[in-house]
């Protein structure tokens, strides 16, 4: 049993990725934790009240450790009005947006969620999109909470360790959903997972977790061999029975292959990997002109919600990683974890 597994008394070196947007509710996270892996709740897009409700619910479903993921606000000021106007004209239903969440409101939301993690003594807190502020890190570490950072390069991983993270998740470019990158990129700098793991494992003194494109036990075995102490998986859990993902989202993943996904900024203003649909194809020429996150995300929210209600995959954000060809049927969390952790996995 390695250091990562010992921290949480795990029997399986797996983290269920904290996928925001209502996918990873307590039912999924608790099912994962109850099978000896680390379940995750995603606080992104939840109000503090809803997060507290979900924390209470998961404690009713499991006594095992789980983590809560928190988006670190980027603190970007509102874009120019003419840019906003242009996108309002191009995005269905975007004219319903009369105001945006202020930077101060984002930080208030962040600290309210940190307070809930402290209040309920949650075992682990992970961060995405940036380095967490030092005061939050200090409070959480003083309370004995294990801190997990997200990085897409060795440089980012080292900064996460320096900030006080106990574990760093290495997100390869194959990963579905939003990129955790937070340093300015130098051209096309998305690093693949197999190149990232050994370099980061050599450079860091804390455990590293591999994330991106892994679907079966061969990927888990490869990541552990290269120096990771665990593996974080999203797409394979997204299609499990216990997942709250939209049925259309699940079906599109089961039908797709590795060439059907791409990185896009169109839905949120931040790079995220998803299955290509009509909205992405029709607006591809605007990829470099989107509003920054979270402003673009706010403008597309009503469109995405309506598409979800109408089962219209062409305007939904169908996040998925590059390993999806191997996903062919909806199974239970228990079945998936048994497949991921076969007997030849050496920990």
Swiss-Prot record:
One Pfam family recorded for the sequence: NMO
SUPFAM superfamilies linked: Inosine monophosphate dehydrogenase (IMPDH)
Residues reported to bind FMN: 69, 171, 176, 213, 232-235
Membrane spanning residue stretches: none
Top enzyme class: oxidoreductase
EC number(s) per entry: 1.13.12.-
Biological process according to GO: response to toxic substance
Key words of the record: Detoxification, Flavoprotein, FMN, Monooxygenase, Nucleotide-binding, Oxidoreductase
A GO molecular-function descriptor: nucleotide binding
Note on cofactor: Binds 1 FMN per subunit.
Cofactor(s) the protein requires to work: FMN
Reactions listed under catalytic activity: 3 propionate 3-nitronate + 3 O2 + H2O = 3 3-oxopropanoate + 2 nitrate + nitrite + H2O2 + 3 H(+)
Family: Belongs to the nitronate monooxygenase family. NMO class I subfamily.
Misc. comment: P3N is a potent irreversible inhibitor of the key enzyme succinate dehydrogenase in the Krebs cycle and electron transport chain. P3N has been shown to be a toxic metabolite to bacteria, plants, fungi, mammals or any organism that uses succinate dehydrogenase.
Role summary: Nitronate monooxygenase that uses molecular oxygen to catalyze the oxidative denitrification of alkyl nitronates. Acts on propionate 3-nitronate (P3N), the presumed physiological substrate. Probably functions in the detoxification of P3N, a metabolic poison produced by plants and fungi as a defense mechanism.
Protein name: Probable nitronate monooxygenase
GN (gene name): yrpB
């Amino acid at each position: 049993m390695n250091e990562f597994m010992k921290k949480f008394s795990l029997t399986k070196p797996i983290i269920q990725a904290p996928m925001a947007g209502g996918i990873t509710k307590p039912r999924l996270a608790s099912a994962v934790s109850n099978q000896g892996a680390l379940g995750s709740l995603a606080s992104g897009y939840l109000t503090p009240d809803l997060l507290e409700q979900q924390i209470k619910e998961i404690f009713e479903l499991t006594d095992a450790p789980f983590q809560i993921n928190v988006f670190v606000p980027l603190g970007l000021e509102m874009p120019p009005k003419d840019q906003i106007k242009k996108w309002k004209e191009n995005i269905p239903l975007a004219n319903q947006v009369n105001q945006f969440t202020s930077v101060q409101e984002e930080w208030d939301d962040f600290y309210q969620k940190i307070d809930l993690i402290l209040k309920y003594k949650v075992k682990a807190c992970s961060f995405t999109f940036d380095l967490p502020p030092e005061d939050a890190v200090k409070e959480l570490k003083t309370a004995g909470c294990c801190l997990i950072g997200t990085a897409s390069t060795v440089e980012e991983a080292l900064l996460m360790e320096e900030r006080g993270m106990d574990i760093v998740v290495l997100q390869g470019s194959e990963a579905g959903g939003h990129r955790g990158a937070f340093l300015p990129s130098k051209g096309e700098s998305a690093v693949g997972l197999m190149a990232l793991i050994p370099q980061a494992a050599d450079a860091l003194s804390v455990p590293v977790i591999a994330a991106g494109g892994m679907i079966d036990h061969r990927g888990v075995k490869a990541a552990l061999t290269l120096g990771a102490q665990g593996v974080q998986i999203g797409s394979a859990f997204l299609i499990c029975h216990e997942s709250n993902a939209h049925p259309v989202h699940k079906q599109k993943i089961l039908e797709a292959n590795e060439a059907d996904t791409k990185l896009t900024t169109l839905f949120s203003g931040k790079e995220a990997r998803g299955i290509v649909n009509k909205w992405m194809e029709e607006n591809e020429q605007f990829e470099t002109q989107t509003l920054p996150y979270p402003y673009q995300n706010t403008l597309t929210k009503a469109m995405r919600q309506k598409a979800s209600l109408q089962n219209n995959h062409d305007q939904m954000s169908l996040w998925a990683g590059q390993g999806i060809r191997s996903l062919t049927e909806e199974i239970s969390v228990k079945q998936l974890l048994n497949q991921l952790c076969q007997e030849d996995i050496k920990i």
